[in-house]
C-alpha cells in the first residue's frame, strides 16, 4: 500500500506540473543575431499564436496556452507545436530563408488503449497539417475560399526506431500509421479552421507526406539501433521525394523532378541537395556520426523548403533533438546565405561556420522552448559520455566550451 501511495502521489505531482506548464502563456519567441554585417531573425510561433483573426486557427482552441512535452496522454493536441523561421533583413525588408513546423512525436504514448492512442495520433497529425497549411498563406487563402488544395509535407522524425532502452520503435510505427491513414492515394481530408471572423470553417486538403525516420542519437549512430527499421520507411519516402532511381548521378524524379520541370532556372541548390541526399543514402552515411549527426535530416528539411514543400520535424518531446535539428538547419541556411555554397555532408563547420552555429544555438529560441516545456533551459543532446568514443561530434562542431556549456544548461537535471 505504501508503494502504491507513493506511485499515486508521484502521478498527481506530475499531473499538476503538466497543468502548470500548459497553462502558462505560450508566446512567440523572436531573437536577432548578426554575422558579417547581416541581421537575421529567428522566430518560433507556438500553436496558440497561429492566428488569422483574434483567436488561434485550431478547432479545439489553445487560448494562449500550450501542450508541453510531458503531456503524453493528450489525444486532442499535438505536443509542443511551433512554426520555426529564419529570415534576413535585406534591402529594407525581411526575406525568409527557411520555414517549417516542429513538434513532439504524434503518438500519445502513455495512453494505454491502443485504439484511443491511434485516434490521438491522427488528431495530432491533423494539427501538424493545419499548422503546415497556416505556414503557406497563399495556400491557406485558397483553401478558405473553398478550393481543394494539395498540401505536401516532408516529415523528418528523429527517433531511434528500436525498443531497446525505451519504446521509440513503437512510437515511430504509430506515427507512420497516423500519416498513412491520412494520406491514402487520392484521399481528401477535411480540416476545421477558425477563420478571421472567429468561425470554424471546413477546408478540403489533399495531403501528401513523405515520412522519414532518421535516428540521430548515440544509440543509432554509435550502436546501430533502429537503422534497418528506419530505412524501410526512408526508401519509400525518398522515392516519393526524388523518384525511383536513387543513384546520385540520376536526374531527380518525384516531387523534386516536378519542381525542377516548373522552375528550371532555380535548379542549382535543389540539384546539389538532391545529389547530397542520394550520396548519403547510397553510402549509408546517415548510419554514423561522421562529424555531422544530422547530415540527412537537415538536408531533407532544406530540400523540402527549397521546392516549396513544408518541412516538419520531430523527436519524442520536440525540444532536444528537434531543437538541435532546428539549430543545424538555421546554421546551414545562414551559412548558405553568406557563402552561396552548401556544406558537404560530414564536414565540420569552419571558423566562421562555428561562429554562426554558436550564435544560432544561443539565439534561435530553442533554450526558451526547453524552458517553456520543463521550466529549465538546456539541450540533452549535449553531453559528455565515457568513454569519449561514444560522444557525438558536438564539441568539434560548436568549437567553443562556453557555448557548449550554455546549450547543455541544466538538461541533465530534467527527466525526459
UniProtKB/Swiss-Prot annotation:
Subcellular location as annotated: Secreted
GO cellular component: extracellular region
Single GO MF annotation: phosphatase activity
Top EC class of this enzyme: hydrolase
Keywords carried by this UniProt record: Hydrolase, Secreted, Virulence
Coiled-coil regions listed: none
Residues at the active site: 315
Span(s) of short sequence motif CX5R motif: 315-321
Pfam families per record: IpgD
EC number: 3.1.3.-
UniProt keyword Methyltransferase, yes or no: no
NCBIfam families according to UniProt: PRK15378.1
Domain notes from UniProt: Contains the consensus sequence Cys-X(5)-Arg characteristic of Mg-independent phosphatases.
Family statement: Belongs to the phosphatase IpgD/SopB family.
Function, as annotated: Converts phosphatidylinositol 3,4,5-trisphosphate (PtdIns 3,4,5-P3) to PtdIns 3-P and prevents the transition of PtdIns 3-P to PtdIns 3,5-P2. It is one of the known effectors injected by Salmonella into the host cell and is required for invasion and for an efficient generation and maintenance of Salmonella-containing vacuole (SVC). Alteration of the phosphoinositide composition of the plasma membrane causes membrane ruffling and actin cytoskeleton rearrangements.
Protein name: Inositol phosphate phosphatase SopB
Species of the source: Salmonella houtenae
